[in-house]
Amino acid sequence: KLIRQLAEVVERVKLQRRDGDVLLTLAKYNVLLADHLRVLCCADLQAASADNYLKRLAKLAEAGLLERSYFERRGYCYWLGEVGKVWVAQMVGRAPVARAGLQVHNLLLADFMVAAMREMQAVGGEAMWEAEWEQIYGAKTRPDGVLKVRLNGYETNWLVEADTGKETLAQVVRKLQGQETYYKRGEWRDWFGSDYYPSTLLITSGGEGRLLHLKRALESKIESVEVPVNWALTTTARLAKVTNIANRPELGPLQQEIWSWLDDTELSSLNLGSQDEES
């Protein structure tokens, strides 16, 4: 039934190439605001043309390709509708992974990724986001995504975790500890094409107080184990204070890609053990 409905919808709305870009982007990020789609799918358009295109999203929603709802004071947020999921499945050969109930969480990640893309574009670099982990991660060890940054001939990978303050500190720590299992399995060497395990960036929307509690919770789990995991902790407010990479000449090229977003960020090299006690 949905396949037949999809054929009717494609004909009725005259599906455009940019519409397809929007659907595939939503499959990747799960949920996005119009401002995110402006950067991710309309960067080649003038402002007026981008505004006109974004008005088309309402038509795609009416056709069942998208779903949308008003999100606080930030306007409409969009995700794939049932018909849109069928279209994506036909294009990529598998159904998109649904992550229901994570609207705030996913929008935090989208905010970060859009900021990363803008920062890299400003200095001639490139930022990419990977979030499909079914083939290489188990359910307990999957990060929220990987930021791949290319600048000055170098590529750096960062595992990214988002914290909206809804989980207990112990839950966050256990999730991060799960990476030790993934590290020991070794598949990451083929995935990243490197013998250097990526550092992890934990972003919290909970403010400075939450950041301090997370830092203490992580430090309480330090053990003398074989797996070194480098962590950077920051807040959404700190990330909003973007410092241009070009103004940080004292940093080497491998560090410049990310540290411009992390002024005054707490950086630790933590060996995360497998203790079970609560933080």
Positions of the model-derived regions?
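Non-catalytic C-terminal interaction segments of nucleic acid-processing enzymes
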Residues: 1-6, 11-14, 20-25, 166-174, ...
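Nuclease-adjacent, charged terminal/linker segments that flank catalytic cores
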Residues: 1-91, 95-96, 277-279
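A short, highly charged nucleic-acid-interacting micro-segment common to nuclease
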Residues: 27, 93-110
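Alpha-helix termini
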Residues: 44-45, 119-123, 150-153, 183-194, ...
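Acidic-and-aromatic substrate-binding clefts and catalytic sites of carbohydrate-active enzymes
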Residues: 45-47, 136-138, 208-209
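A general structural detector for well-ordered alpha-helical segments in enzyme core domains, enriched
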Residues: 56, 175-179, 214
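Active-site metal-binding core of divalent-cation-utilizing nuclease and nuclease-like domains
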Residues: 69, 102, 114-158, 164-178
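Hydrophobic/basic alpha-helical segments enriched in Actinobacteria
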Residues: 111-113, 117-139, 205, 221-240
